[in-house]
Amino acid sequence: MELNNLKPAEGAKHAKRRVGRGIGSGLGKTAGRGHKGQKSRSGGFHKVGFEGGQMPLQRRLPKRGFTSLTKEFVGEVRLGDLEKLPVDDIDLLALKQAGLIGEMMTSAKIIATGELKRKIVVKGLSATKGARAAIEAAGGSFAE
């Protein structure tokens, strides 16, 4: 089997409906466009959202909110994920390289989900009270 030999199954494809080709086809004369009016003419279209001169919906509704340019991207990391990391010194770069947080994240916070049994050193990351207690109970520490 090769890509250039692939064909759709018999009867799976239908011929395109040819309009305006005689009365016997059922789509002759007006070709399914009806009689008169803007939509029957060639080039007879209106832009999307046009409501015949009435104020369109997207302009009747109020604008809401904005996109902050100073938004901080903070990633969340679970204790269980830190357990699986091969390194003992954990900082933002190590989390990004391991794929635990996205490249756009400017900081990260450790949350107390899962278990941590080994000793780690956390550098420059924040943590919840429960996560901080669990890390220190496992013999780990925080280096700010």
Curated annotation (Swiss-Prot):
<comment type="function">
    <text>Binds to the 23S rRNA.</text>
</comment>
<dbReference type="InterPro" id="IPR036227">
    <property type="entry name" value="Ribosomal_uL15/eL18_sf"/>
</dbReference>
<dbReference type="GO" id="GO:0019843">
    <property type="term" value="F:rRNA binding"/>
</dbReference>
<keyword id="KW-0694">RNA-binding</keyword>
<dbReference type="GO" id="GO:0003735">
    <property type="term" value="F:structural constituent of ribosome"/>
</dbReference>
<dbReference type="GO" id="GO:0022625">
    <property type="term" value="C:cytosolic large ribosomal subunit"/>
</dbReference>
<comment type="similarity">
    <text>Belongs to the universal ribosomal protein uL15 family.</text>
</comment>
<keyword id="KW-0689">Ribosomal protein</keyword>
<dbReference type="InterPro" id="IPR005749">
    <property type="entry name" value="Ribosomal_uL15_bac-type"/>
</dbReference>
<dbReference type="InterPro" id="IPR001196">
    <property type="entry name" value="Ribosomal_uL15_CS"/>
</dbReference>
<dbReference type="GO" id="GO:0006412">
    <property type="term" value="P:translation"/>
</dbReference>
<dbReference type="Pfam" id="PF00828">
    <property type="entry name" value="Ribosomal_L27A"/>
</dbReference>
<dbReference type="InterPro" id="IPR021131">
    <property type="entry name" value="Ribosomal_uL15/eL18"/>
</dbReference>
<comment type="subunit">
    <text>Part of the 50S ribosomal subunit.</text>
</comment>
<feature type="region of interest" description="Disordered">
    <location>
        <begin position="1"/>
        <end position="62"/>
    </location>
</feature>
<protein>
    <recommendedName>
        <fullName>Large ribosomal subunit protein uL15</fullName>
    </recommendedName>
</protein>
<keyword id="KW-0687">Ribonucleoprotein</keyword>
<dbReference type="InterPro" id="IPR030878">
    <property type="entry name" value="Ribosomal_uL15"/>
</dbReference>
<feature type="compositionally biased region" description="Gly residues">
    <location>
        <begin position="21"/>
        <end position="31"/>
    </location>
</feature>
<keyword id="KW-0699">rRNA-binding</keyword>
